C-alpha cells in the first residue's frame, strides 16, 4: 500500500453486517419452524461456511445477496450429512455447530482450514462431554477435525474458566436438546448475541449476573432479522478517523451491544472524539450511527472485564496506541494467542518492523507511542484483523507497506479496501 500524501478520510459508510449475528441467524433460523429472512447479512467467507454446513444438514437456504431466506425445519429437523462439514476459517461455525450436533441422532465430522485445525477445541469438548456428548478429536490433539456422534444430553451448570461467547453458545445450543436446565457461568460477561437472538426466536433463556440460563426443547419460530453493522469491522474506520488529520467519518447503523462496545470506551478514554447518533434497538440489539473526528490520542491501560468486549479489536487498538502519545499497556488478553494467529506476537513483530517501540508480555503488550513509523513488509499470517489493522497503519507510515495475503480480509469485510479508498478520495494504491 502506498499513501504518499496523508489525505483526510471523509464521508459516510455503511459497515457490513455483524459477523457474530449473521452466523447465529443462519443457525437459529435452521433450527426454527418456518421461514426466517435475514437482511444485511455478512457475505464474508466465514458466514458463507455456516450456510454451507447447514445446507449439508438438509436445510434449504437461499442467498439472493439482498437477503437470506432459511426454510427452517424445527429443532429436530436436521438430517445426517453425506459429506464432511467444512467450517473453513470460522471458529464460530466450528464451536457453535458442535453444540448443536451433539444432540442429534446421527454422526457428523467437522473440519476446517489449516488455521482451524490448530485452534483449541478442548474448551468446548470438555463441557459438551460433561453433558453426555460423544465428541472426539480425529487426530487426538484437541483440535479439528472433530467427530460428533449424537447422544442423549443432560443439562449442566458449567463454570467456564474464560469469558468466551463461543464456549457459552456451544453449551447453550447443546442445552436446547438436553434434559434439564443448562447454566453457563463466566468470570466476566462475554458477547450475548446468542441469548438475545435465542430469546427472539422463542427460547426460554435468561441472564443472572454472569450466568446464562436456558431451558430445553423450546419451539423456535422463524423470524425476520435485520443484522446491524459489525462494530469489529467499524473499529478500523473508527481508528482511521481518529488518527488521520482532518478526518470525519459517519459510520451508519452499527451494533453497539454493551458486550461489544469496548472499542468505543477505549477510544473515548484515549481522548478520541467519538459520538453516538440515532441510537435505536432492533431485534433486541442496540444500534447507532458513530461519528468519528480526528483527535490527539494518548496512551492508557486496558485490562480486566473490558477485554471480552474488545478482544477482536486489540490489533487495531495496538495501531492506535502506536500513534498515540505516551504508553499503552494491554493486559489480560492471553486469548489473543489462540485466534486466527498469535495476535500478540504478530502485532509486536509487524509493528517492530515499522519502527514502533513495542514489547510482548505473557498476556498482552506494552506500546510506547509517538514514534515515526516507516514502511515495511507486513506478514498478515492470513489473519483478516491483522491485514486490516496494518492497512490503517499504512495511512500514516512514511514509505510503502506491503501486506502479504492482504485479501484475507474477505473473511469478514470483502469491500474493506474499496471502502477505505473511497473515504480517502480514491488516493490510495493497493
Residue ranges and their predicted role:
Residues 1-430:
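Structural preference for solvent-exposed beta-strand-turn elements
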Amino acid at each position: 500500500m502506498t499513501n504518499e500524501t496523508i489525505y483526510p478520510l471523509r464521508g459516510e459508510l455503511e459497515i457490513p453486517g455483524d459477523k457474530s449475528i449473521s452466523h447465529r441467524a443462519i443457525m437459529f433460523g435452521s433450527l426454527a419452524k418456518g421461514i426466517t429472512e435475514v437482511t444485511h447479512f455478512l457475505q464474508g467467507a466465514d458466514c458463507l461456511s455456516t450456510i454451507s454446513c447447514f445446507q449439508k444438514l438438509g436445510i434449504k437456504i437461499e442467498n439472493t445477496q439482498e437477503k437470506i431466506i432459511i426454510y427452517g425445519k424445527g429443532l429436530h429437523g436436521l438430517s445426517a450429512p453425506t459429506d464432511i462439514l467444512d467450517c473453513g476459517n470460522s471458529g464460530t461455525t466450528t464451536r457453535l455447530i458442535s453444540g448443536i450436533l451433539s444432540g442429534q441422532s446421527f454422526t457428523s465430522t467437522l473440519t476446517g482450514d489449516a488455521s482451524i485445525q490448530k485452534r483449541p477445541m478442548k474448551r468446548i469438548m470438555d463441557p459438551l462431554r460433561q453433558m453426555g456428548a460423544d465428541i472426539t478429536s480425529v487426530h487426538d490433539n484437541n483440535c479439528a477435525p472433530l467427530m460428533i456422534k449424537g447422544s442423549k444430553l443432560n443439562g449442566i451448570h458449567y463454570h467456564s474458566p474464560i469469558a468466551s461467547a463461543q464456549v457459552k453458545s456451544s453449551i447453550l445450543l447443546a442445552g436446547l436438546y438436553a434434559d434439564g436446565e443448562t447454566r453457563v457461568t463466566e468470570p466476566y460477561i462475554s458477547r450475548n448475541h446468542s441469548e438475545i437472538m435465542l430469546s427472539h426466536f422463542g427460547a426460554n433463556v435468561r441472564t443472572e449476573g454472569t450466568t446464562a440460563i436456558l431451558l430445553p426443547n423450546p419451539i423456535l419460530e422463524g423470524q425476520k432479522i435485520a443484522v446491524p453493522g459489525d462494530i469489529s469491522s467499524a473499529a478500523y474506520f473508527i481508528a482511521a478517523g481518529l488518527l488521520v488529520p482532518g478526518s470525519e467519518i459517519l459510520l451508519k447503523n452499527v451494533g453497539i451491544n454493551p458486550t461489544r462496545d469496548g472499542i468505543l470506551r477505549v477510544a473515548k478514554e484515549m481522548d478520541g472524539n467519538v459520538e453516538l447518533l440515532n441510537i435505536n434497538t432492533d431485534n433486541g440489539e442496540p444500534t447507532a450511527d458513530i461519528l468519528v473526528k480526528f483527535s490527539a490520542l494518548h496512551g492508557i491501560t486496558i485490562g480486566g472485564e473490558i477485554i471480552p468486549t474488545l478482544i477482536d479489536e486489540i490489533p487495531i487498538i495496538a495501531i492506535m496506541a502506536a500513534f498515540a502519545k505516551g504508553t499503552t499497556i494491554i493486559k489480560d488478553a492471553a486469548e489473543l494467542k489462540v485466534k486466527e494467529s498469535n495476535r500478540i506476537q504478530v502485532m509486536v513483530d509487524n509493528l517492530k518492523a515499522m519502527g514502533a517501540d513495542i514489547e510482548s508480555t505473557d498476556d498482552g503488550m506494552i506500546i510506547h507511542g509517538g514514534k515515526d513509523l516507516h514502511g515495511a513488509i507486513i506478514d498478515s499470517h492470513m489473519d483478516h484483523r491483522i491485514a486490516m489493522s496494518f492497512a490503517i497503519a499504512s495511512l500514516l507510515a512514511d514509505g510503502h507497506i506491503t501486506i502479504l495475503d492482504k485479501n484475507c480480509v474477505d473473511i469478514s469485510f470483502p469491500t474493506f479496501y474499496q471502502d477505505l479508498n473511497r473515504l480517502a478520495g480514491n488516493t490510495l494504491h493497493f
